[in-house]
């Protein structure tokens, strides 16, 4: 029974990692123009309208 649960957990983690990678696949990379684009900037980046670029998030 514990092997089945362990296999289910491994499968769930694998599925989550695949979905996370596919979300970031169709996004704008660092330095790409982002104004009036249908795509969004990748995770960790924001579109700065004044510079029209995807740049790292400033905290």
UniProtKB/Swiss-Prot annotation:
It comes from the Eukaryota. The natural peptide is not amidated. The recombinant peptide is amidated. GO terms for molecular function: toxin activity. GO terms for cellular component: extracellular region. Residues 1-19 form the signal peptide. Its main location: secreted. Coiled coil: none annotated. Keywords: Secreted, Signal, Toxin. It is found in: Secreted. Expressed by the venom secretory cell of the spine. The spine is a cuticular structure containing a single large nucleated venom-secreting cell at its base. It is an independent unit capable of producing, storing and injecting venom. On the back of D.vulnerans caterpillars, spines are grouped together by 50 to 100 to form scoli, of which there are eight in D.vulnerans. Belongs to the limacoditoxin-3 family. Probable toxin. Shows a relatively potent antiparasitic activity against the major pathogenic nematode of ruminants (H.contortus, EC(50)=2.6 uM). Does not show insecticidal and antimicrobial activities. Does not induce increase in intracellular calcium in mouse DRG neurons, suggesting that it does not induce pain. This is U-limacoditoxin(3)-Dv33.
């Amino acid at each position: 029974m514990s092997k089945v649960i362990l296999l289910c957990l491994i499968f769930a983690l694998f599925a989550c990692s695949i979905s996370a990678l596919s979300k970031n696949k169709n996004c704008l990379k660092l330095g790409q123009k982002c104004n009036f684009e249908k795509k969004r900037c990748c995770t960790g980046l924001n579109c700065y309208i004044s510079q029209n670029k995807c740049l790292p998030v400033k905290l």
